[in-house]
Each structure stands twice: as C-alpha cells, then as structure tokens.
C-alpha cells in the first residue's frame, strides 16, 4: 500500500493520530495522561504550533494542529513520541511490581532480535496525518474526537471526559490543556 502524500506549509490545519505500540491501553492511567498532556503543552511552547483540538484515548491520540514556521507535523509528532517514549518505560519499570505496570511493560517489550534502541517501544512507528482544508472538515474532526469517548462507552457524554478539548470549547474549562483559537 503506498504511503499517503503529505502537504506541509503554513496555513494548513492537520488532523494527526498516533497510536501506542500494539494498541496497549497506556492512557488508561491518569499519571501517563497527565505526563503526555504536559509534554504536548511544553512542545507547543517550544515549537510555537497551535493545538486546535484533541482527545486522549486509552491507546491513541488524535489532534488538530496548526503548524508553525519552526515545525510541521513531520517534526512535531516524532518529537512528542520521542520525549514521551523516554519517560514512560522508566516510570513503568519503577513501578513494575504493580500488576498494571507489569502488563504494560510486557505489552511494550520488543522481541530480542529488534532491540535497536532499547527493549521497549512505546509508539507505533508511523502516524496518520490529514490536511484539513475546510471549516466543514475541521468541525467534522472536532466532533469525531469529542464523540470518541462516548462512542467507545467510556463516558455517557463528552463533557464527562476531561482529556479532550470538548470541555474547553463548551464549558470554558482550560484546566487540562488550553486550546489555541484560529484567527
């Protein structure tokens, strides 16, 4: 299957999705959700891109981002994955006696023949990236993200899931991760 063509440039909104290796439910943990969001916020400040929407699901995250002159998705997503992949295995190893941490370590362990950069892989290698060219598509992607926790049966309504931009847009709650507005 051929790779999808990516169009990077200023004034292009991107819908991105990255998944945890083997679809492990790493983000069932508030600790890792919080660390991920803090890392994303720090990277946004460093690279000056905008976050228009997101939802953090147990095994993946989709987001709408507006790249900056300093960084497009081909730099943003790998940087985010690299930074989180450093602290997550260390944190799991420090708490490996806890059953959940032990299961996560097992799920993220690579076979011995592929230990190129360490014994664990946190993220699947690639990420999905779609240019969002219209307001209709932007709203479609926001609605998809905000509805995802409800569709998966994790909550009964989007406002009950704190790890989403829904609360920012509809409740004025920016306590988890403030969103950037498009001008």
Model region roles, listed by residue range:
Residues 1-183:
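Short catalytic/metal-binding and nucleic-acid-binding patches
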